[in-house]
Amino acid sequence: MTTPGDVITLALSKGRIFDETLPLLAAAGIEVLEDPEKSRKLILPTNRPEVRVVLVRATDVPTYVQYGGADLGVTGKDTLIEHGGQGLYQPLDLQIAKCRVSVAVRQDFDYASAVKQGARLNVATKYTTIAREFFAAKGVHVDMIKLYGSMELAPLTGLADAIVDLVSTGSTLRANHLVEVERIMDISSHLVVNQAALKLKREPLRRIIDAFAQATAAGAPK
């Protein structure tokens, strides 16, 4: 019989990260038994009674793992940087959910000239740590405008000169007459583990970590 102290809790967010984590779970012999897009449950069972999946916002995954709401989780590098990574063991870059963090502006905005002339830019983003460090390294003066969604609207409405956001194919930027002008960093998703849980549940967690590592090295099918 599985007791609460024996349960391994994995925090995931819906969408691309969830979908691309499934093959890694399969490599560890774990199958999620319900489709998060069809179920209203936030805690999903698996074929292993000692393993469960909790569905949280992408930005909350590191926090759940840090404070023990989950034993481990999968989260983007962008989210980890913004969180700070405190209290987290980060054993693996899983090489899934790849994209990039970039600077984008209106097609008619001369970004290069503005930077060269030392203009102070209004930058809209939810990635304030990444953006601030990037522009500081370039010696560009910026005022940050914290937004949580519909980032593309900011330059179109005059709220901001530029945005810093995740870019995958660039189709959303093009559809909104924006252009990518600088690539800040490449992003992929990482496995994060609660440090206390790794001591208390070392063997079961190590088995999952090792299975993920082997599947990542082999290139688990997406």
Swiss-Prot record:
GO terms for biological process: L-histidine biosynthetic process. CDD domains: PBP2_HisGs. Pathway: Amino-acid biosynthesis; L-histidine biosynthesis; L-histidine from 5-phospho-alpha-D-ribose 1-diphosphate: step 1/9. Keywords: Amino-acid biosynthesis, ATP-binding, Cytoplasm, Glycosyltransferase, Histidine biosynthesis, Nucleotide-binding, Transferase. One of its GO terms (cellular component) is cytoplasm. GO terms for molecular function: ATP binding; ATP phosphoribosyltransferase activity. Its EC number is 2.4.2.17. Lacks the C-terminal regulatory region which is replaced by HisZ. This is ATP phosphoribosyltransferase. It comes from Paracidovorax citrulli (strain AAC00-1) (Acidovorax citrulli).
